């Protein structure tokens, strides 16, 4: 009986370790990698939506989530209209460093994280 209980407990722990975690605040928003992700998100958005080209200023906030890689929810300050008008944008970026994968999951002017 004790062996069965330990086996079930071990199985539960392993299963929990494989599940995605909740979102947690990015500890150092000024980290060069985080700023690069924000710059990349703006560049990628400009590529798929060239009608309203944005200029990256900086990442101002965000959260991260461990999955099979990492999801990032970023609050990005950027300028539109040739740099005259700045605004806050939201981007969700998936990154898997070991496979060199990066995807822009969503991008929104009126983000609600």
Swiss-Prot record:
Annotated motif Secondary area of contact: location in the chain? 65-69
Q: Location of site Reactive site?
A: 22
Give a yes or no for keyword Secreted in this entry.
yes
Q: Which GO terms describe its molecular function?
A: cysteine-type endopeptidase inhibitor activity
Q: Which UniProt keywords apply?
A: Plant defense, Protease inhibitor, Secreted, Signal, Thiol protease inhibitor
Keyword Secreted listed: yes
Q: Per its UniProt record, what InterPro entries does this chain match?
A: Cystatin, Cystatin_dom, Cystatin_sf, Prot_inh_cystat_CS
| Pfam families cross-referenced by the UniProt entry | SQAPI (PF16845)
Give the range the annotation lists for the signal sequence.
Answer: 1-18
Annotated GO CC locations: extracellular region
What does the sequence similarity comment in the record state about its family? Belongs to the cystatin family. Phytocystatin subfamily.
Give the protein name, as stated in the record: Cysteine proteinase inhibitor 6
Q: What is the lineage of its organism?
A: Eukaryota, Viridiplantae, Streptophyta, Embryophyta, Tracheophyta
């Amino acid at each position: 009986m004790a062996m069965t209980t330990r086996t079930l407990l071990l199985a539960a722990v392993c299963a929990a370790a494989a599940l995605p975690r909740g979102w947690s605040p990015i500890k150092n928003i000024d980290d060069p990698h985080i700023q690069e992700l924000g710059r990349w998100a703006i560049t990628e958005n400009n590529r798929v939506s060239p009608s309203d080209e944005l200029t990256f200023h900086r990442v101002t906030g965000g959260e991260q989530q461990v999955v099979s890689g990492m999801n990032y929810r970023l609050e990005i300050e950027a300028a539109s209209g040739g740099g005259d008008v700045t605004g806050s944008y939201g981007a969700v970026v998936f990154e898997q460093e070991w496979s060199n994968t990066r995807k822009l999951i969503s991008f929104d002017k009126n983000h609600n994280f």
